[in-house]
């Protein structure tokens, strides 16, 4: 029994022949589903081929006869006003933290990046997650799938039209352009860029229509334009509170990306590594003030800061072979290991580059982690941790799948691959409430209604992943299929797909 319901399990061990099957119990019958050795082989295609291209900010995105959106936010961005609490939870402190005055245009931010979710903001933490997971994907598997044309010079993306370049590398490039632009323009990584007016935050439809794409010029009247600038203050705001964890997150992402881009875009690869090293040096020479601690929130505790600094040292060491980074990494490793569950994925990524003594040191921690995975079987019939928080928990399930794969790679005798497949099975339909796949466009019965940029049409974006099941008090599992506007259940977000090391 789980929540208020009794569940039955079917033993598939007697099924040895590939084919199309259904399950039936009483008057309940599932949709037809395949059993084969290659069922997951193409399951990730829509996410790379469609979802990520659609989420690309500052680009015109076409799919055959359909235009998903124009090249939006070319007027990015104005420095956010000070002492401002934004309706979406963003904050700007009592100072800008840089040379720009409130509502002054910050040049160079109108490049790269992805819409974070169903709305149209750029959250830098999400950009970190995407760049890191794509860099990991490239270095682990060399994925050279090419189904998309992406031209940064013309700001043009066309879905299902190959251009002879690996899409993974082109997406890494797109994320790096935004992260590098932030540091070059402002001097450090920023929390992100968001709408300046509430009517824009509620905007449904083509993102290109949210602003006039002309940089705000306060010397012009409200509807006046000189062709390059306008007097309409509809530009997005850059929130610029400086925090160490955001800086280190950008350094981690750029250092990893520099390796992936080395042959594809050597110039950008060098620039990414230069900026990553600049951030490292700047953080070690910068005296943090109380304001920075305030806006770091839960990320300001010493243990977390040591762990993220260790991760930055690791990526920089891998990209440069500089012993100074390795020395700092070794100094901080004990803190990383003390928080094993939080840092399991990055520790697993370190193992192939460390000596056997480190692998032996980590082994008992992996054994304990494997024991905790076994205990999850007692919590529910699905063998994954189902969130009981206000926001549904597919993000954590995706993160667990990635972590379990990385640990299985080094400790196959300890981490059963079943712990990877359970998470995938859950995402593709084996979960409470209904048996729809939480990945739009993928699975026997995929989600057809989601909180994406096309939610007004009660539609979806192929390859997007929704948050999933929410447990309503006292014990009702829910995921609405008839109403896309519940973002805690149905919002298509970057973090539900790309969670390798994000805290």
Where are these regions (language model features)?
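Non-catalytic carbohydrate-binding regions of carbohydrate-active enzymes
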Residues: 56-95, 108-114, 331-494
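Short glycine/serine- and small hydrophobic-enriched flexible loop segments
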Residues: 132-142, 252-262, 311-318, 348-353, ...
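Extended ligand-binding groove/face enriched in aromatic
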Residues: 51-126, 141-257, 264-281, 285-301, ...
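Long, well-ordered core segments of solenoidal/helical folds
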Residues: 38-62, 171-187, 273-291, 318-341, ...
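Asp/Glu-centered strand-loop micro-motifs enriched in Gly/Pro and often flanked by an aromatic residue
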Residues: 1-16, 100-122, 485-494
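Ligand-binding face of N-terminal immunoglobulin V-set domains in extracellular IgSF glycoproteins
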Residues: 1-37
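Residue-level detector of conserved catalytic or cofactor/ligand-binding positions
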Residues: 495-503
